[in-house]
């Protein structure tokens, strides 16, 4: 009798998991997935353009998402309804667009993005859904575009940007997510275009502007973010 009960239980589980329902016939209520016109959290397989398992109303395991033309554009992994594991996103030509990881519903670890031509677009680390450490971005031609440091999701220390031709575009210092310290910008030809100082997110002191030939065109003086004096040369 005991063996019969075990077999019966296994059969019930197998039957419930084998139930296939088109994703359009699943609805979400209070964080759980239900088959339309039912009151029991769904357990089974979602089919069609959104394919994956649902257990007790929660997504579980690998899910595949397709466009209307049948092109795979997203892979997500779930555990008890939360993203947990690798995430892959694709362009319509099949080229990988994004690769990252989640843990307990939050983005964690290395995240990499690619341009449609296959060249890397950006790369940086995440911790508990916040950017952490160095984020680097590139133009489609492979030239470095930006380097930004993050701490607990906020910009910290030096941020550097470049033009597409490789010439440095700007250097900005941050502290706890706010501009703090020297800010310098350059024209595309390499001549300095701007320089000023920030304190706790506000411009403070003398700021200077240059034209593309290297001549000073204007100087302004600020105090606590407010213009005190401006001189146009």
How would you label these PLM feature ranges?
Residues 4-13:
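Sec-dependent N-terminal signal peptides
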Residues 13-233:
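Glycine/tyrosine- and acidic-biased, solvent-exposed loop/turn segments at the edges of beta-strands
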């Amino acid at each position: 009798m005991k063996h019969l009960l075990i077999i019966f239980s296994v059969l019930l589980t197998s039957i419930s998991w084998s139930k296939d329902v088109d994703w359009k016939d699943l609805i979400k209520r209070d964080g759980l997935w239900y088959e339309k016109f039912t009151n029991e959290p769904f357990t089974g397989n979602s089919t069609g353009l959104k394919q994956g398992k649902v257990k007790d109303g929660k997504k579980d395991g690998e899910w595949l998402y397709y466009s209307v033309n049948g092109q795979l554009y997203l892979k997500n992994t779930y555990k008890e309804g939360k993203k947990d594991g690798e995430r892959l996103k694709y362009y319509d030509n099949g080229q990988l667009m994004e690769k990252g990881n989640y843990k307990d519903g939050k983005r964690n670890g290395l995240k990499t993005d690619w341009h449609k031509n296959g060249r890397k677009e950006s790369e940086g680390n995440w911790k508990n859904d916040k950017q952490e450490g160095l984020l680097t971005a590139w133009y489609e031609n492979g030239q470095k575009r930006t380097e930004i440091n993050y701490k607990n999701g906020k910009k910290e220390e030096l941020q550097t940007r470049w033009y597409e031709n490789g010439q440095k575009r700007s250097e900005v210092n941050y502290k706890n997510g706010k501009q703090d310290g020297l800010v310098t910008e350059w024209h595309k030809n390499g001549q300095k275009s701007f320089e000023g100082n920030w304190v706790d997110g506000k411009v403070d002191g003398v700021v200077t502007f240059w034209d593309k030939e290297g001549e000073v065109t204007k100087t302004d003086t600020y105090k606590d973010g407010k213009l005190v004096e401006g001189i146009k040369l």
